[in-house]
Structure formats: C-alpha cells, structure tokens
C-alpha cells in the first residue's frame, strides 16, 4: 500500500487486528521510506446486484420501494412494521451476499415471497398477486394451493 505521507509505493504491516463488530481488519502500517506510521481499515466491498425487470431493463435495487410494496401487501394483515423492516433487511443481506451481478425481478419476488409465506400467508398472497406473473387465474390458484399445502414453506 502506498504511504499517504511520502507516497512511497511499499509499506509494511506492523500489526493486524480483527474488528468483529464491523467485519473489518484494522492494520497498523509503517513506511520504511519516511518512517511514519498510519492505520488502515479494510472491509469487503459487497455490491448490490441490479434488478432486471420484465422489460429487460437494469435498475438499482430500491429498498424503500420494497418496503412500500410490503406495507401495501400487509394492509389488514397481522404483519407488523418491524417484520416488514426485517424482511427488507434480510432481502438486502441475501442480495449483497449472493455474489450475483444481476437478479431477475421474478427471482427477487420469489425470495421475498419465501420469507412472507413464513410470516403471513395473507400478505404473501397480496404480494404475489402484484409481483408474480400469472398467465391466467388457474396459475394463481395453483400457486396459492401449493403455498397453502406446504404451509408457508414454498
């Protein structure tokens, strides 16, 4: 790593410590050229995959839009705002750690539905009606029967 004081291209690591709470590594470095010490904080760079819509357009993942859609689906259901926030956080975490560059909107909807089915079937049905592509009412009925049959484990 380049020294921030003298721009010497090579520095030595004097000490490394794992920072558990931040998932980071703190390193104390020493420059052999100027003799100064400095610290660095290293974290993994996780990128959020882009969402590929039905029209094949790429757009950034929008957590607020997901939160709004979940809130609309949860109207008159037992799903609490805290559960909605947790579902959004869990979805973001899964997207970050997926390692994918892009995710189809249908796969994103399935990911959210899987979590919703564990929490509240009514909200999951409303969410599915908005975000899954059903060719006809029979497809929706088939999906609903499968979701009920598996008891939210679909």
Swiss-Prot record:
Q: Which UniProt keywords apply?
A: ATP-binding, DNA-binding, Metal-binding, Nucleotide-binding, Repressor, Transcription, Transcription regulation, Zinc, Zinc-finger
Tell me the Pfam families matching this sequence: ATP-cone, Zn_ribbon_NrdR
* Name of the protein: Transcriptional repressor NrdR
- Names of required cofactors: Zn(2+)
* Listed GO MF terms: ATP binding; DNA binding; zinc ion binding
Lineage, top-rank taxon, reads Bacteria
Q: May I ask which residue range the UniProt record assigns to the signal sequence? A: none
Report the gene name: nrdR
Gene Ontology terms: biological process:
negative regulation of DNA-templated transcription
**Zinc finger (unnamed) in chain:** 3-34
Any coiled-coil ranges, and where? Answer: none
Q: Where is the ATP-cone domain?
A: 49-139
Protein source organism: Neisseria meningitidis serogroup A / serotype 4A (strain DSM 15465 / Z2491)
Could you tell me what the cofactor note in this record states? Binds 1 zinc ion.
Q: What HAMAP family does the database record attribute to this sequence?
A: NrdR
Please give the function described in this protein's UniProt entry: Negatively regulates transcription of bacterial ribonucleotide reductase nrd genes and operons by binding to NrdR-boxes.
């Amino acid at each position: 790593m380049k020294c921030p004081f003298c721009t010497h291209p090579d520095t030595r690591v004097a000490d490394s410590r794992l920072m558990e709470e931040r998932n980071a590594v703190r390193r104390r470095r020493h420059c052999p050229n100027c003799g100064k010490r400095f610290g660095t904080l290293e974290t993994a760079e996780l990128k959020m995959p882009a969402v590929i819509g039905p029209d094949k357009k790429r757009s950034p993942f929008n957590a607020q839009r997901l939160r709004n859609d979940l809130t609309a689906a949860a109207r008159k259901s037992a799903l609490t705002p805290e559960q909605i926030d947790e579902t959004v956080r869990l979805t973001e975490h899964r997207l970050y750690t997926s390692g994918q560059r892009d995710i189809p909107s249908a796969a994103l909807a399935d990911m959210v539905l899987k979590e919703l089915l564990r929490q509240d079937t009514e909200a999951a049905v409303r969410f599915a009606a908005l975000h899954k592509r059903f060719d006809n009412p029979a497809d929706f009925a088939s999906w609903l029967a499968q979701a009920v049959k598996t008891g939210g484990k679909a």
